[in-house]
Amino acid sequence: MAGDDEETLDYIAEILEIVAETSGVEVEVVVDEEDGTIMAEYLGKGDELAVLIGHHGQSLDAIQHLAHRMAFRGMDERKPLSLNAAGYRERRATALHAVADQAAEAAVRDGRPVLLDPMGAQERKLVHEYLKTRFDVETYSEGQEPSRRLVVAPVVS
């Protein structure tokens, strides 16, 4: 829908502000572009932001998807959009890395696959990428959305 880059950023900010306002949450919205990716962030009080973040970031993912679809509707060139809320994505990544490390250690120690709790595609990808550096485990996903799980399995030599 939006034309040039600045217009697109403004339109995304407007969409995000409307979602927050409709949810009854007072926030500041910051939208910028970094290395070809549109970076958007909700800034505000943690308690209020919880409504926009949702369980394990599910609401944040949905808002991100909605804003991206609306901003680039009918356009040939689409840029990735990453929506954060007061550093939530970084905190969640740290927590997922810890879970991944524990699962990898258990898989190697016990010699059998470890199933992680169901998670969204972005989080599964983050764990896949994180554990790629290890040569003693492999990862794969199984199941159907929304119950799709990541499996951490020991590499058999």
Question: Each predicted region: which residue ranges?
Answer:
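RNA-contacting regions in translation and RNA-metabolism proteins
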Residues: 1-157
